[in-house]
Amino acid sequence: MLNIAALRQQQIPLAAEPRSPVPFHILMKPIGPACNLACRYCYYPQDETPVNKMDDARLEQFIRRYIAAQPAGAREINFVWQGGEPLLAGLSFYKKALALQARYAPDGVTISNSLQTNGTLINDAWCRLFREHGFIIGLSLEGNEALQDYHRPDKRGRSTWSAALRGIDLLHQHQVDFNLLVVVHNEMAAHAAAIYDRLVSLGARYLQFQPLMSEGAALREGYQLSADNWGRFMVGIWRQWRKRCDRGRVFVINIEQAWAQYFTHTSGSCVHSARCGSNLVMEPDGQLYACDHLINAEHRLGRLDEQTLAAAVDASVQLPFGQQKSLRRECQTCSVKMVCQGGCPAHLNAAGNNRLCGGYYRFFSDILAPLRPFSRDLNGLKAWRAAFVGTAAYCVAPYPDDIPL
């Protein structure tokens, strides 16, 4: 009689999982939309999506097949856990996941884990797990206490600022690497410098600013983000980061990724890649989708147990939303196309234009100013580093600070 458990322990595949010819990631939502907060702008509200927790059998199937389907030669495999609030899955869930990763990881391949949380449930036990296994934590936070408590209350409408800061303090105490993620909406546009200063005062070394997605609860609550306000806010962050000479101390992902993309011609973000579709999303029941912000029938790829992952990735990258994102007419002559690439398809309006286009143009135009004299290759990168990195030159370069925000 076939001993399934023994085969798994020996890493003998139950069925051949073909490798994907292209690199891909799957953002895993083990608890679906379940969350202990009631953010007013949530793009993934619980009342629109059934709440389930991934069972152990599907967790094992996902980890085994996700590892097996990576392209030949992959040296690192990253698992990304998100929600809702993924910590609601429980400590034991992630211990099982880590054990399965160790069981199925081939020799010489590094397994890494990233997790996005609101921070309010973090305790010492979680931090010990994160530290021991090298988790990279993303912590979602508003720019200050007043914004946090209004826009990100708990289920009873109560303040969450102190609980989130307690989570940040614990991450510091346990020396867990983390970044702070801020969702930007119109109300924040005039307060970029103050928000930046407050985040840095919390000891954050990595910051990421994400434009509001006009979907889910955000639509019902009337949240908006205009192109003007997106550009105004991000230029404000850029100016404050430069004014404080924080390069090397504070890593603003929006800036650093664009700078790297200018020289390397590749993006670390699907939003600013020439094509997208290789960052899939999986719900607790095994449903796969082509994009975290396009959870609908048009972008549904089927269930995990209905197909190979290579087939799902191939179907995803062939969808028009990812193939055509940087091919719109207005992008072809744009001076910042090399780092924008049309932005996220989820921000397209009814006319097929990116609602944030003008904001991206303003922000990228400003931050690319110090790079323009250098060639877009490794030699240019070396020359730019020699001229700017490790000096105060980028703090005082002739940028348009006299132009009002």
Swiss-Prot record:
Superkingdom per UniProt: Bacteria
The protein's annotated pathway: Protein modification; sulfatase oxidation
EC number: 1.1.98.7
Enzyme class: oxidoreductase
Domain Radical SAM core: 18-249
Any Gene Ontology CC annotation: cytoplasm
InterPro entries referenced in this protein's UniProt entry, alphabetically: 4Fe4S-binding_SPASM_dom, Aldolase_TIM, Anaerob_Ser_sulfatase-maturase, rSAM, SPASM_anSME, Sulphatase_maturase_rSAM
GO molecular function list: 4 iron, 4 sulfur cluster binding; metal ion binding; oxidoreductase activity
Keywords: 4Fe-4S, Cytoplasm, Iron, Iron-sulfur, Metal-binding, Oxidoreductase, S-adenosyl-L-methionine
Binding site for S-adenosyl-L-methionine: Y41, G84, S140, R152
Cofactor: [4Fe-4S] cluster
Binding-site positions, [4Fe-4S] cluster 2: C270, C276, C291, C344
PANTHER family to which the protein is assigned, alphabetical: ANAEROBIC SULFATASE-MATURATING ENZYME HOMOLOG ASLB-RELATED
Assembly with partners or alone: Monomer. Interacts with AtsA prior to its export to the periplasm.
Annotated family: Belongs to the radical SAM superfamily. Anaerobic sulfatase-maturating enzyme family.
Name this polypeptide is given: Serine-type anaerobic sulfatase-maturating enzyme
Lineage: Bacteria, Pseudomonadati, Pseudomonadota, Gammaproteobacteria, Enterobacterales
